[in-house]
Amino acid sequence: MGKGSSGGGAWWAFLLLAGVLLAVAATAAGAEEDVATEVAAAADRDPKEDLRWCRKGCQWQYGQDTRQRKECERDCRQRHREQEQDADEEDGSGRGSCRSQCMRRHEDEPWRVQECVSQCRRRRGGGDDDVAVDACEGADRCRERCERRHRGDWQGKQRCLMECRRREQEEDVDDRCPCPCRRQCERHGDPATRQRCVEACQRRREEERRHGGGDADEEGSRGGRCERKCRRHSDWQTRQRCLQQCEQRERQEEGGRDDAGDGKDTYCADRCQSMCRQRHRGDREMQRRCARKCEREEGCPRRRDATADADEAEEDDGNDRCSQQCQHHRDPDRKQQCMRECRRHQGRSDDDDTRAGEDDS
């Protein structure tokens, strides 16, 4: 009799424990659903909630990385200003539906609503109404995976979603980005930062096309010629400098400002170089930068004589040597620091050789 009572008591204790566990699980799931509902309702009432959640997403994603977190928050503020400017145009234009679509699609990811609205409005502004609000094909996979791993932990699920989105962006960013913007944003090692750079570049190019008309096409053809010419440089910084110099020469040629034969222009450039040699003795790289800055400030036209071409070729060769020497650095900041030290050391070596030659003569 006592033995049966003991077995029955254990059975009732087991049932009671199972009921408690079910109640806890239901409470956690309900709490997560309540948080998501509260987030969606708050953001629907006040568009400024998008900005707040976007900033919170930057904090979750980058944590102690102050530089990238500030860059992410700056993009949040930029998108918020654009949405405020577009607020007056929403009535009757159909663009107001972007927000409701994004709210439904990202009700459990409030930090993505602001970016989604910006992308939707850009597509609507370009006349492409049939494009989906979110082009990421792996969005549903990420959501299902993170819900299984972090059931009941809303904040943990947000971090999981961020990591999953970042991996998805890293896999398909090269397929979705226009070539000029992708080339311009290669310097960013972090996929999320590179994607934001590409989106900002796309916005600028769309604004140029809207306001500039044919000038944007002309700029694109000029950039294509310079891109082919500067493709030989493997280092990103050297290639960008080559592109800037090439495009500047193209603009000067198109504007009819080729004044290389004018003695006054030569005197202007020579004066800058002489001043910078005195100011930065022994540092050839600083002499070049100082001379370029001085020529821009003084308005000196770029020389097209053999000396200028030789200097540019010499600088390119030096940059190629330095880029090969520093290519083992994966971190962009360390690679740039290595490049600067290499150029500075190379400039001193060239000056020492020059002084030695003068002493021998």
Swiss-Prot record:
Signal peptide limits: 1-30
InterPro entries reported for this sequence: Plant_Antimicrobial
Domain of life: Eukaryota
Compositional bias of kind Basic and acidic residues: 296-307, 328-341
Subcellular locations according to the entry: Secreted
GO cellular component, one term: extracellular region
Keywords: Antimicrobial, Disulfide bond, Fungicide, Plant defense, Secreted, Signal
Protein name: Antimicrobial peptides
Taxonomic lineage of the native organism: Eukaryota, Viridiplantae, Streptophyta, Embryophyta, Tracheophyta
Stretch list, region Disordered: 296-361
A GO biological-process term: defense response to fungus
Major localization class: secreted
